[in-house]
Amino acid sequence: MNSDILLQNRIKEARQEKKLSQEDLAKLVGTTRQTIISIEKNQFNPSARLALLICIALEKKFEELFYF
């Protein structure tokens, strides 16, 4: 399995729909703003736990936010 494959995501759009800043989302899910930036730019795959927390915070299903 190739661990270099990055998930694509729609986090930025979903976050903006909820009128949340990157800092707001980071606080809600217990991470840093820089981590949210990296995930939104598809430079970093979140852990399963962090992905789930993001889905909960943005009130979206996993498949609505993440794709290959």
Question: How should each PLM-predicted stretch be described?
Answer:
Residues 49-64:
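DNA major-groove recognition helix of helix-turn-helix/homeodomain DNA-binding modules
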Residues 1-17:
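A short, Lys/Arg-rich alpha-helix, primarily the initiator
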